[in-house]
Amino acid sequence: MTADRPALRTGDGDTRLSFGSNLSSFTEYLRGHAPELLPENRIGHRSHSTRGGDGMESGDLAPHGTTIVALTYKGGVLLAGDRRATQGNLIASRDVEKVYVTDEYSAAGIAGTAGIAIELVRLFAVELEHYEKIEGVPLTFDGKANRLASMVRGNLGAAMQGLAVVPLLVGYDLDADEEARAGRIVSYDVVGGRYEERAGYHAVGSGSLFAKSALKKIYSPDSDEETALRAAIESLYDAADDDSATGGPDLTRGIYPTAVTITQAGAVHVSEETTSELARRIVAERTEEGGSAR
């Protein structure tokens, strides 16, 4: 005769899982037990106005991350971002981290309201880890993309007040039929719509138009990792040249774009030594050419 397993209490403020729980989504569990901890609920909501007391839009009251680029290459995919955050017409920070590894085979970059976006991506990483612990297997890439879409959709109320978050997800799909198609890029809109980017490159944020224009000229799907990384940094340089909210390589302060590469071996942060060397080389070449793009 066996005794029933006791259940953990789930009273107010108790966020522990009960025995036998099959809830594999940490976000949904949090929504049911401690909704105030979700990124979209950590701000004060205004019922009728998006303007602050001084007449500023809500979106100008918090720092914003700007430009993120992603591109596939032979054997993998990479994600890179500039380091600047702006607040209205001011530079709020020069060294923000906007590119995050979310699990062994995926990474996400953020554009939009920095505070909410950073919390959302960190929660997404916990979501993926929680799912794998509960189910015993990792989510497929499509599953990851769908989970992130639902999290972005959950921020719609804040987005309607000007505090939008627009992530860019990349990953290596272990279930892909061809290794050449294993690197994948997924973009989102503010209401949680997800879009597979099949051109091999994409960009989000205020400088995305200029970054994509640059990538259109220099991108090659058959490039190796170093060539792809150079293309990403060069596109961010071009974006910073025309968009004041995007920060280019800052040689004076030693601030350079950050990047993550993902291959069959997993996700890896590109070292600052590598990005700084490429950035210095690009700046030197542009200086010799009189500031013109090649």
From Swiss-Prot:
The gene is prcB. Pathway: Protein degradation; proteasomal Pup-dependent pathway. It comes from the Bacteria. The keyword Lipoprotein does not apply. GO terms for molecular function: threonine-type endopeptidase activity. Belongs to the peptidase T1B family. SUPFAM superfamilies: N-terminal nucleophile aminohydrolases (Ntn hydrolases). It is an enzyme of class 3 (hydrolase). Its EC number is 3.4.25.1. It catalyses: Cleavage of peptide bonds with very broad specificity. The active site is at T66 (nucleophile). This is Proteasome subunit beta. GO terms for cellular component: cytoplasm; proteasome core complex, beta-subunit complex. CDD domains: proteasome_protease_HslV. GO terms for biological process: modification-dependent protein catabolic process; proteasomal protein catabolic process. Keywords: Autocatalytic cleavage, Cytoplasm, Hydrolase, Protease, Proteasome, Threonine protease, Zymogen.
